Amino acid sequence: MWDDQAMYVSVLTREYPPTIYGGAGVHVAQLVPQLRTLIDVDVQCMGQPREGATAHAENYPEGANGALRAFGADLSMVDAIPDEVDLVHSHTWYTNLAGLLAGVFHDVPHVISAHSLEPDRPWKAEQLGGGYRLSSWAEKTAYDAADAVIAVSEGMRADVLRAYPELDPDKVHVVRNGVNTDEFHPVTETDVCRDIGMDP
């Protein structure tokens, strides 16, 4: 498929540095630099312009429910993804619809990373009304059509198959979150522990 040229992946995410507020954002922020050491990576995110990614404002349709505005950003992402990509990889319901549409539009596989699931957040129905119905629909539709789903744990894999029992279990793979050992490693210094009153 790629001969001697690097694979080209478009990562679709709502969160990307410097705007990160949850685990999926941390995951993508750690994943992309590692992927870029191996392959070519395009990043499409939501929000304000930033270095290393193409950002899409969540402002259309103006004044609409947040889910509709996320879909507006999704459509903008699909249009901005380079024609040369070999695969699209979406994270969370915010970009799962973009991944589905981009896969169809560019005729490439769509892979989803499962961080959380809308069916496991029923309280959002009361908070978001129709927006929750839309986010749930987008997630289910994207999962049903995805070429592969990556669960970040065995527990998440079980949750995906429980929430979406029609999925082929062979399409749902576990790839645990990695750890950057340059950043996270054992230390022998105890100054910080003492400074906060903790017995090292």
Language-model features: where?
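N-terminal subdomain of nucleotide-sugar transferases
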Residues: 1-51
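Histidine-centered beta-alpha loop that forms part of the nucleotide-sugar donor binding/catalytic region
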Residues: 14, 114-117, 176-177
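A short, charged, and often flexible helix/loop element on the N-terminal side
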Residues: 50-81, 126-127
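Short beta-strand scaffold positions
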Residues: 90, 151-152
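Short His-centered aromatic/hydrophobic patch
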Residues: 90-95, 114
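Nucleotide-sugar donor phosphate/pyrophosphate-binding loop at the beta->alpha transition
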Residues: 108-111, 119-141
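Carbohydrate-associated surface elements
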Residues: 155, 178
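A short helix/loop element that forms part of the nucleotide-sugar donor recognition site in Leloir-type
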Residues: 185-198
